[in-house]
Amino acid sequence: MGQGKFAARNLVRTAKKFRWSDSVYSRRALKLKLKADPLEGAPIGRAIVLEKVGVEAKQPNSAIRKCVRVQLIKNGRQVTAFAVGDGAINFIDEHDEVTICGIGGRAGRSMGDIPGVRFVVSGVNGVSLNELVIGRAEKARR
């Protein structure tokens, strides 16, 4: 391949062609992250609790992480969200409306030892889950 004085057009064309083999570029150019994202690019979303589930932690840890299976209101997609805090799962009941946001793993993926869980419950029926766990607020009855 030419590196000479008049090779610029050729170099640019080749660079553009081989750029597609870079996974980061191709995902960004085709907007794959946005298409796959259940929240559709939004930072938080509202959802209805379908059931409580216990997710086993990955090795070398041994625990059952308390999560909830929820259905998003905006598009009907089902995702699993982690309930953070000691006894937090007790404040969440089926058919409650919860607010979920990303768990903060790299590239929008899961975090730590909880496999396949990419979201966190931040609120229940309009009240912060953290406030409920601390005891500073009471859950609103619907």
UniProtKB/Swiss-Prot annotation:
Q: Origin, by domain of life?
A: Archaea
Question: What are the entry keywords?
Answer: Ribonucleoprotein, Ribosomal protein, RNA-binding, rRNA-binding
Q: Does the keyword rRNA-binding apply?
A: yes
One Pfam family cited in the UniProt record for this chain: Ribosom_S12_S23
Task: Kindly give the InterPro entries that the UniProt entry links to this protein.
Answer: NA-bd_OB-fold (IPR012340), Ribosomal_uS12 (IPR006032), Ribosomal_uS12_arc (IPR022863), Ribosomal_uS12_euk/arc (IPR005680)
Assembly behavior: Part of the 30S ribosomal subunit.
Q: What is this protein called?
A: Small ribosomal subunit protein uS12
Q: Which gene encodes it?
A: rps12
